[in-house]
Amino acid sequence: MKITSRKVVVIGTGFVGTSIAYSMINQGLVNELVLIDVNQDKAEGEALDLLDGVSWGQENVIVRAGDYKDCKNADIVVVTAGVNQKPGQSRLDLVNTNAKIMRSIVTQVMDSGFDGIFVIASNPVDILTYVAWETSGLDQSRIVGTGTTLDTTRFRKELATKLEIDPRSVHGYIIGEHGDSEVAVWSHTTVGGKPILEFIVKNKKIGVEDLSNLSNKVKNAAYEIIDKKQATYYGIGMSTARIVKAILNNEQAILPVSAYLRGEYGQEGVFTGVPSIVNQNGVREIIELNIDAYEKKQFEKSVSQLKEVIESIK
């Protein structure tokens, strides 16, 4: 699929949708940005507010409220709509209500004649990416969930902070569910190209026992933020904009998005967070890491849990 107009439609103008829109405008990613919401006044107000800052951005951009007919010639439709996670709720607690919302949205998008790429940011993202694919009839590669992109950047940031290293020099992934069963891939985590276990032997800033605590902190990061401010949106806003950028610029970038497994990691028939090559066609290829036995077992548990939830909503 060739990117033509750099037109992106964002469905849902809550905290997440507007954070994604704001991030895309600031980075000069789009030529046209259309906001859709069940509350038309909200969409119009957000568009007007964003327009007030366009002249300070990197590129001139059209920003407006619209409707589903605007999806027809869009390159990307980003879906953020759904009920929000409340304090004490897991992301999977949201599944029944948000699955119904996702089916309704995707049906209306496809009825417009849309032939682009979906980026799904609604939670639980792995399940709703599956629902979007099943409803759309598009190839799995064209449905891209945000997956563990945010978890991975949290992981790198936390480890970098402990080691007093620039996060851009720390490489590693969180895979599996964007949620409580996510898996930190320590076996492929490196600092300046050096495996983490080798690095900490000489670094002395953290020990092996600290690694488990760190991955748990990453897993629970959203709960801490929700307890303090009721919602998370800036981090996922910037993470989603990064995925959009990779698609629009045909980057061939490796990002841990929610992608459809066809035997990779010994699993199939589910969308979940795995390192994937992302380009103008969506997910070009999944990168299959040679994870260790413990990580493989945890990943299998994560995928199994997702499959159970998918079966429950069919």
Swiss-Prot record:
Question: Known SUPFAM superfamilies for this protein?
Answer: LDH C-terminal domain-like (SSF56327), NAD(P)-binding Rossmann-fold domains (SSF51735)
Q: Does the keyword Transcription apply?
A: no
Pathway field: Fermentation; pyruvate fermentation to lactate; (S)-lactate from pyruvate: step 1/1
Q: Which residues carry this modification: Phosphotyrosine?
A: 223
Binding sites annotated in the UniProt record for substrate: 85, 91, 123-126, 151-154, 232
Q: Where in the cell is it found?
A: Cytoplasm
Gene3D superfamilies cross-referenced by the UniProt entry: Lactate dehydrogenase/glycoside hydrolase, family 4, C-terminal, NAD(P)-binding Rossmann-like Domain
The active-site annotation reads 178
Question: Could you cite one Gene Ontology molecular function of this protein?
Answer: L-lactate dehydrogenase activity
The organism sits in which domain of life? Bacteria
Stored NCBIfam families: L-LDH-NAD, PRK00066.1, PRK06223.1
Q: Which HAMAP family match?
A: Lactate_dehydrog
Q: Which protein, by its recorded name, is this? A: L-lactate dehydrogenase 2
